[in-house]
Amino acid sequence: LTVAVLGLSVEKLKEVGYHPQFVTVHVPDHTGYYPSSQQMTLRLAFQPASGRLLSAQILGRRGVDKRIDVLSVALQGGMTVLDLENLELSYAPEYGSAKDPVNVLGMVAGNLLRGDLHTVTAAELEDHLDGWQIIDVQSPKVFAHGHVPGAINVPIDSLRNRLACIDKRQPVVVYSRVGYHGYLAYRTLVQLGYKVFNLDGGFKLFSEGGSRMGIASGEAS
């Protein structure tokens, strides 16, 4: 396992006077159809007004070094998250994806910067348990194996048919395993007039130490 760090953590940035935005993504280290693909986790902090890069951290088994090098050069060059979206990086199925993890990181951060996405951290979720609805859009089988305490299970494929169980008067937090289906649910509910947040890092980050709430299990009622 390899851990790479560029600049200060989000917590340290706040201590020295920054007010960063940040995103956490989990993406394959190379194309999923090629054997032995494994997920890597990337976090990027950036300035909320300009999108200029501030710091990054990566955790993974392969390809961590080249991604942190790309981000290091981008930071030194004064690039923004919007620049990361369009970086042209080398591709071969055994080494990367058509959309490199750095591109995906930039796209998610770009959505946040443009206001197309609003996220909430596990720590922030803990402070609003009484007032927010938590929606798990994973399958019932996955939900039964583990979920955020207090969440209700509304699988992404049946979301539009189960809107009656989601109160429009209260904020909604949606999540999936790594965030992709959570984002699809986010876009669907936003377009229908709900106030929605996507859980940063998905259930993967939540369950691997992003929260003090613990993990619930059991089938949806």
Predicted regions and their residues:
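Generic secondary-structure signature for well-ordered alpha-helical cores
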Residues: L1, Y18, Q76-T80, L89
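Mid-to-C-terminal Rossmann-like scaffold of FAD/NAD(P)H-dependent oxidoreductases
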Residues: L1-R61, S97, P101-D127, W132
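Generic non-transmembrane alpha-helix signal with a bias for helix starts/N-cap capping motifs
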Residues: L6-G7, R67, G182
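A short, polar/charged loop-to-alpha-helix boundary motif
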Residues: R62-V81
